[in-house]
Amino acid sequence: MGSLGSGVLHANSDLDLIIVYHADGNAQSEGDRSLSARQYYSRLTKAFITAVSAPMTEGRLYEIDMRLRPSGFQGPVATSWSSYQNYQKNEAWVWEHLALTRARAVAGKVFLLNEFENFRNSILKSYHRENIFNELVSMRARIFQAKSLNPWDAKIGPGRLQ
């Protein structure tokens, strides 16, 4: 998502991530204490976030932003592929679909990367332009109501990025 997904990552970028895994519903990890796929990928994701965002003597490698994952902070840190598809089809807000314009699968098996890209395109093509425009106008109005205009804010305001 964000600058990583759109290919404009720079040294001060944070990583907007959604972690999606593909496993059977009853899949178990190997080892002394087997874990369900959900538990395994949750622990793996948390370890990854810690490793990438931990403070070091020269600073952090990257800040990780997971707020765009399905259900935000209330949702799991790693989501199964089927749950992600269901969420996008049935529960996601328009702004979450718009965020998909800057989403790219950056790791995984090639067939899954292709499957994600096809799914992303199908979601983006399913919207009627008129509905998106009306939703955007409403969303911008709510943003302007909630946040006072700052003349130095290049992001939010008439003629600015948002």
Region spans (language model):
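A nucleotide- and high-energy phosphate-metabolite-utilizing enzyme signature
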Residues: 1-162
